[in-house]
From Swiss-Prot:
Annotated keywords: ATP-binding, Chaperone, Metal-binding, Nucleotide-binding, Zinc
List of residues binding ATP: 137-144
InterPro entries recorded: AAA+_ATPase (IPR003593), ATP-dep_Clp_protease_ClpX (IPR050052), ATPase_AAA_core (IPR003959), Clp_ATPase_C (IPR019489), Clp_protease_ATP-bd_su_ClpX (IPR004487), ClpX_bact (IPR046425), P-loop_NTPase (IPR027417), Znf_CppX_C4 (IPR010603)
Gene coding for it: clpX
Listed SMART domains: AAA, ClpB_D2-small, zf-C4_ClpX
Protein name from the UniProt record: ATP-dependent Clp protease ATP-binding subunit ClpX
GO terms under cellular component: HslUV protease complex
GO molecular function terms attached to this record: ATP binding; ATP hydrolysis activity; ATP-dependent protein folding chaperone; protein dimerization activity; unfolded protein binding; zinc ion binding
Binding sites annotated in the UniProt record for Zn(2+): 31, 34, 53, 56
Residues covered by the ClpX-type ZB domain: 19-72
Length: 442
């Protein structure tokens, strides 16, 4: 409690005594903590023979909030989940990708274990940081894995798009803007930001345009890789406060990126061909090993054999590949996996739409043939899990438009014909038999 509050208590006691003893109801009331009168504050809250003003309530809230946050930070540091626990929680949100989950769980566990041990004295071995590179097709779950990890560990998290980044001095975003976004996520708390996670998406789009040096600068390709090197490895980045523009007279926030975990992700379309060319390349002469081209091999299977040299041939510079020592590849999602994604995760799309309909007191049912049809459409569009929502939005648009105006609908049923667009959703009305709209004439 502030000294001013303590010093004012005797005065307040005298005032309260005067008020009680002197039968004058017109006397002022005073805050029991700071001694301010009811006219000096916005609100005076009365208790059994005591009063507290709104300013003291705010002060108490701030003190309690700080103590709770410190206690939570300490407990989270001591309660770092094991790799198996991390993988188990990822299973609740991400279907399949078991190998990628295992790699991520171990890498993240070791990273934060390293942070928890860094302040201990007597440790002669300094542990290095292991940033992560996720390689997988569009819609396979790269971003979702990173988001779920950050939510699980309760650390600041931001997503950056590599395609918008350019070298400093050119039109576009500087790499320091990534750290600025991370600071915004934690209300510019530098200490919190320095233990956060940054996910850089579309990292394959900043590959070198060609192996041959050119007269023109590659400001959005190799130039960005060079700019990201120090940031990812660990440097002190100067960031303008509160998102302002940089100018010479400005004071900058200094953010140390050594303990920020960087996860880079990309589809790397065409990388499988680089891998296959390497694995099928044979020698010359009688002692050469004879290898046949592996026809019909899935992209995910090829990507599992990726090596750093393949990434360099794809267009990443060797120094950049070296800063991302942990490689995790994700498989293409098949029809069965897409059907699981629609129904099994905690935040599955069918559960989300069912919740929206429940708010209108209507049950929503997806039949199994409808789920298969949605999965088939997503496979045809080659958008992976990302395309599932757009398909369902298109199917349910008219129904969601009509339902709020109809008070007698109790249930909506979606089957395969609705997904294929040959019929409308089946609406079941209260106290009536199900009525389906007639199918169109053949």
């Amino acid at each position: 409690m502030p000294s001013s509050c303590v010093a004012s208590l005797p005065d307040w006691i005298d005032r309260m005594t005067d008020t009680r003893n002197g039968e004058d109801s017109g006397k002022l009331l005073y805050c029991s903590f700071c001694g301010k009168s009811q006219h000096e504050v916005r609100k005076l809250i009365a208790g059994p023979s005591v009063f507290i003003c709104d300013e003291c309530v705010d002060l108490c809230n701030d003190i309690i909030r700080e103590e709770v946050q410190e206690a939570q930070a300490e407990s989270s540091a001591h309660k770092l989940p094991s790799p198996k626990e991390i993988s188990g929680i990822l299973d609740q949100y991400v279907i399949g990708q078991e190998r990628a989950k295992k790699v991520l769980a171990v890498a993240v566990y070791n990273h934060y274990k390293r942070l928890n041990q860094r302040d201990k004295k007597g440790d002669e071995v300094e542990l290095g940081k292991s940033n992560i590179l996720l390689i997988g097709p569009t819609g396979s779950g790269k971003t979702l894995l990173a988001e779920t990890l950050a939510r699980l560990l309760n650390v600041p998290f931001t997503i950056a798009d590599a395609t918008t980044l350019t070298e400093a001095g050119y039109v576009g975003e500087d790499v320091e803007n990534i750290i600025q976004k991370l600071l915004q996520k934690c209300d510019y708390d530098v200490e919190k930001a320095q233990m956060g996670i940054v996910y850089i998406d579309e990292i394959d789009k900043i590959s070198r345009k060609s192996d041959n040096p050119s007269i023109t600068r590659d400001v959005s390709g190799e130039g960005v890789q060079q700019a990201l090197l120090k940031l990812i490895e660990g440097t002190v980045a100067s960031v303008p406060p509160q998102g302002g523009r940089k100018h010479p007279q400005q004071e900058f926030l200094q953010v140390d990126t050594r303990n920020i975990l960087f996860i880079c992700g990309g589809a790397f379309s065409g990388l499988e061909k680089v891998i296959q060319n390497r694995s099928t390349k044979g020698g010359i002469g009688f002692g050469a090993e004879v290898r046949s081209k592996e026809e019909g091999k899935k992209v995910g299977e090829s990507l599992r054999e990726v090596e750093p040299d393949d990434l360099v041939k794809f267009g990443l510079i060797p120094e950049f590949v070296g800063r991302l020592p942990v490689l995790a590849t994700l498989d293409e999602l098949d029809e069965a996996a897409l059907m699981q994604i629609l129904t099994e995760p905690k935040n599955a799309l069918t559960k989300q739409y069912a919740k929206l309909f429940e708010m209108e007191s209507v049950d929503l049912e997806f039949r199994s043939d409808a789920l298969k049809a949605v999965a088939r459409k997503a496979l045809e569009r080659k958008t992976g899990a990302r395309g599932l929502r757009s398909i369902l939005e298109g199917v349910l648009l008219d129904t969601m438009y009509e339902i709020p105006s109809k008070k007698d609908v109790s249930k909506v049923v979606i089957d395969e014909s609705v997904i294929e667009g040959t019929s409308q959703p089946l609406m079941i009305y209260e106290n009536s038999e199900p009525q389906a709209k007639a199918a169109p004439d053949a």
